[in-house]
Amino acid sequence: MSSLVSRCQVIALLVLFFFGVCLAGKDIPANFVFGDSLVEVGNNNYLATLAKANNFPNGIDFGSPTGRFTNGRTIVDIIYQALGSDELTPPYLAPTTRGPLILNGANYAPGGSGPLNSPGSTNLDSWSPEQLKAMMFGVNYLAPVFFKKMDGQTIAISSLSTLSRAANLYRQILAKEVAKAIAQDTTTDLPKASHGVSSSSVKEELRPKETYFCDFYGRPIVYPILTSARRVTWARKINYDINNM
């Protein structure tokens, strides 16, 4: 509670300061920004990180990506221009942000900011097989149980329902596209029976080996290592199993 009060006091002081500057008819002499992806303007473009906003639809209102994790201006850009500035605060790491230009302000915020020089680094190697299985098979069970235990979270439950529908639609579309792509090369990959080889032995070649996974509750899920002749059938089976978990 005390930390919340302190934050409100800081925000109130900043609002009063900027309001006083505007009433006095003075321009803000400089604007220095610290934060994360909410206010970043392109510092990550100059860092060795995967967290970059240098592709569409980011920056679509500018006509091209600017390094902002948004379609247009950040909240700091909007406030700064509303206070009378004609320019946007440049990223500190940009090669052009040098010399006297820094005296007018600079943006030091990187997306995914943290104590390291490379923000947003991946940590897939640190995940255990159990965590990966939970993400693959257990989310559909775990999420409703989690939200049902939270009293009064109707908004969260509504959002969960929307996400569930979107996830189901994505799985259906993905399964159709996979089945369509696999069906195109099925006829070319089928082994042909030669003289002296019975059709039963060819079918034996097509029999896939099995590999075992467990869902979030430890129940075995058996999926074969697919050969071309069975890919379409098992693509449909995987989609059916996931939708009915």
From Swiss-Prot:
Enzyme Commission designation: 3.1.1.-
Cellular component GO terms, alphabetical: extracellular region
Record-level Gene Ontology MF annotations: hydrolase activity
Keywords recorded for this protein, A-Z: Hydrolase, Lipid degradation, Lipid metabolism, Secreted, Signal
Gene Ontology BP annotations: lipid catabolic process
Entry keyword Glycosyltransferase: no
Location within or outside the cell: Secreted
Positions of the catalytic residues: 37
Signal peptide: 1-24
Similarity comment: Belongs to the 'GDSL' lipolytic enzyme family.
Name of the protein in its database record: GDSL esterase/lipase At4g16220
Organism: Arabidopsis thaliana
